[in-house]
Amino acid sequence: QSDNPGFNWWLKAIDEVITKAVKTNTPLTVIKPDPAKHKAEMPTMLTTTWGQQMPYNKLLPNTAKGRLLTGCVATATAQVLNYFKYPLRGIGSHTLYYPANDTNGDAIEANFGNTVYDWANMKDDYRGNYTDQEANAVATLMLHCGVASEMQYGGPNEGSGAFMKDCAEGLRTYFGFSEAEHLVRADYSSNEWMDIVFGELSSGHPLIYGGVSPGSMGQDAGHAFVLDGYNKDGLVSVNWGWNGEVNGYYKIDL
């Protein structure tokens, strides 16, 4: 266990897979990339080790429960947008509130069309020193990614959450990623799913990936992170969006 909810989801999921394999006496395998279709391996694409607290949440309201967290969907989305350094500016505007849907609460507004994203001043790693300009550059992007994905914001103890379908919609509507799609793992076999994953990664497209823990509530229920490469053995590079903690290669055909 760690305090990283995305990694904890993976631990629970792999535990279920191993338990089932033992019960059914089934060998545990990892699906490997098909060299006829995909690159044999794809080196890790992301160089960022971003998280959800300062300076990433610097521009979010500071409430009685503490400063609101960016949310894992926003952190994952921001890291992918930063990888592409795109767009230069967004489209339109949108406003959310904290508490969610309470128009008398704190307004969290993103004016996408009037914002030029300061890609040049976004650091890969904010665990050391950084300037106000570097902090504001990444905090603006994080706020916009949250608002675009209809984030339900919460403080440090409750967490912030959003649905993956809203993330895809936000990428299309506010950031101009017209081909962004929301795919559901249950609609595909393991081989079909990993063929999609390897295909996108092999093409240089990091994936915003979501996991849901059955029976969990609150911050531990759903998690978003980034898949950004794979090795020849079929293990996939995961950036958990937790300040670089436990980033590495994992079996994700779960």
Predicted stretch roles:
Residues 87, 226-227, 245, 252-254:
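Short secondary-structure boundary/capping segments
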